Amino acid sequence: LPDKEGGKVLNDPYFWFLLVSLVGLLGFVSIISLNTGLNHDELEHVHSAWYVANGFLPYGDFFQNHNPLIWYICAPLLGFLGETAASILAMRVICLFFMLGSLAVSLLITRRLTSSLPAGIVSLLLLLTSSFFLASAYQIRPDVPQVFFGLWGVYFLLLFIEKSSGARAVLSGMSLALSFLFLQKAVFLIGAAGLVFVFFNFRDRLPFRYLLLFGVSFAAPILAFLAVLFFNGLIEDYYITNYLVNLNRIRTFSPLRTISRFADRDYLFLIFALFSLPVLLLARGSDRKTGSLAFITLLMVFSIRFHDRPHSQNFLPMLPLLAIGLSVFLHRFFERFKTPAPAKILIMLLLIGIPFRNVLPKLHSSNRPRLEAIMHVVENTGPNDPVYDGNIKFNVYRPDLHYFWYSVNRGKLLDSYNRVTGNRFGKYDIYDLIFTRKPKFISLFDIDREDPRFEKLMRMYSSTPYLDIHRLNKEK
């Protein structure tokens, strides 16, 4: 797609400022993605990939409340690299590539709306300096590929609005379906994009085959997934763990708590991005593609109120859309007022420089202590030795004591599961499990220290040099 500016962009100091900033930030993010400390959510998905690699089935053999595609993508790495720290870092690299892919699609969308390469780069800089985006954008979690495929769904939708074709309808529907197969929360983007697709089909009186192609291409991957669940006898378990449990959480919190953190860290980005959306949607002369993007983004913003535990990763799908909207707004603002390069550079320094201060502390974070603890457990256990690690801090390559291996503390997913299953695991007792199976390593997470059995437990286990990892004493 050619730039309106043509060759002039190469003589523009503003363009070179943007390009140098982009290269520097991409290098910075690549470094921190390999070194930043590992989140326990990440280890949850590493452990699930290990289960899958060893022939266990999610939902039936071990508890999970996410869609499964990321584990099946990561599992082959364990065959190549083994139960090593390198496998975990390789999974980080995969998610880094998904993040870079999301940036590339954001660039494509912005250029499609503006015919401007500098505007496309602006959308990337806004994301790469957002501490909220970088809090989870390269982590080992299904949210990351969910965003990648969701953005492709939006891109092909905008192409369809520009010029309808069956191929564009199919690619949009299939991309949105793949986004869902990584994470159920994609339903919010799917709903928003689906509304726009249906609206333009009826408004422009397009042939019914486009709706059919979009619907079939969206439904086919999901039906294939459901067929796999059915033939493995997992439909009921999947419905319970991924829907009933998630919809009946006991511990919830208001979106305002997370939004206030977002506003505190990235307030300039948030304020100007939210201001730009109604302008792009309602301004005279706003084209259909830009209005559609603004509408989808506004619906994504409003969808946050339907999240019962909106952590920073729940904002990931909307952040690229907000960045694209703001970059389109800035591009039109600069064009309308014929803003000189020094003024544009100053505005961008404010927009990306202030929030970047909150990203710099990531340079001092290290994943080495966590990886050393993980490998200590691996090196001192056999392949079939169970481990208790209820908070997912060190056990990623060994079996657990129970079907429910995380979120076992009061008010969390185990209690939600028991609520919707007639107390199926109501007799869950971590003391009984430990005394019966005698795992070589345990955590004291969610172990009642007031329980009279705690003293016996402490006679059985001794502390290690690693935080909250206790090793079974040798029998005398």
Give short role names for the model-derived ranges.
Residues 185-186, 232, 350-476:
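Extracytoplasmic
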Residues 104, 266-301:
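Hydrophobic, aromatic-rich transmembrane alpha-helices
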Residues 19, 24, 93-114, 129, ...:
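Transmembrane-helix motifs of polytopic, lipid-linked glycan transferases
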Residues 136, 143, 151, 188, ...:
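Hydrophobic/aromatic-rich transmembrane helices and adjacent perimembrane loops
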Residues 123-124, 168-184, 190-196, 220, ...:
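Membrane-interface alpha helices of multi-pass inner-membrane proteins
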Residues 126, 145-162, 168-176, 197, ...:
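Specific aromatic-rich, kink-prone transmembrane helix
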Residues 14-16, 106-129, 147-148, 166, ...:
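Transmembrane-helix signature of polytopic, membrane-embedded enzymes
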Residues 112-117, 153-171, 203-205, 275-288, ...:
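Membrane-interface transmembrane helices that cradle and orient dolichyl/undecaprenyl
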